[in-house]
Amino acid sequence: MGSPPGRGPLVDGERVLLIDAKERRYLLTLVAGAAFHTHAGILAHDDLIGREEGSTVSGSTGRSFLVLRPTLADVVLKMPRGAQVIYPKDLGAILMAADIGPGQRVLEAGVGSGALSMAVLRAGASVVGYEVREDFANRARSNVAGLLGPDVDYRVERRDVTEGIDEVGLDRVLLDLPEPWRVLGPAAGALRPGGILLAYLPTINQTAELRGALAEGPWGLADSVEILRRTWHVEARSVRPDHRMVGHTGFLTTARRLSAAPASGTGPEAPVSPAR
């Protein structure tokens, strides 16, 4: 009986991450008989195939590389891309904010290079993507298949989500679009009551526009956040924040789809009568 995927010795055809002495990272797919060419020399793929991950290997010049299987964050940062990707610090927050889990049906509009699709699929959901650009759609399909294989429950259609959503009874709708407020009508019709809408936007002006539109429709519990990531230098007695940090990348806005006919005065956004 073989090892589960992602365990055991490295095999022909899987992705690996090489890290050199300066912690530069290289993502490659192992191919028997091939070689990896770098400033540090040539490293034969055959010298990696069959090794345990966590091993140290040397190239033709004697310089060493640590070899590991890549994490999802490694793949997102190193994979081929056309559109700007959603960064790992935001991907984790999106999975929590949208409460993504196994068995859910998710619509993603604006798939870009497929980073968010990968994260949602890995969490066990199925994904239908709407993408207006064929080159982005093809890149997303390729990147997802490269990480998760061809059998994941993933379909990308070339279409404009503002023209309508065919799916109904969706659990989640994820939007990476410049004008997500134009999709609120179709999204409300596609989401089940209690479902979650999440939009990723680069500017606060766009976020404010979206929040205003949400306040006028069947949405409740709207919330907007920004995720900042700061690493620390920790070495012996030298402990301080790193000089550089991953600051603003985008704003995450979530809202719950309310029932079409909520009881008067019982919803979370229900107006409060002034005291007399």
Go through each PLM region and give its residues:
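Conserved SAM-binding loop of SAM-dependent methyltransferases across substrates and taxa
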Residues: 113-124
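C-terminal substrate-binding/active-site "lid" region of AdoMet-derived donor-dependent transferases
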Residues: 2-3, 181-251
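Conserved SAM/SAH-binding loop
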Residues: 87, 112-113
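S-adenosyl-L-methionine
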Residues: 130-180
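Conserved class I S-adenosyl-L-methionine
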Residues: 101-112
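Conserved S-adenosyl-L-methionine
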Residues: 122-128, 193
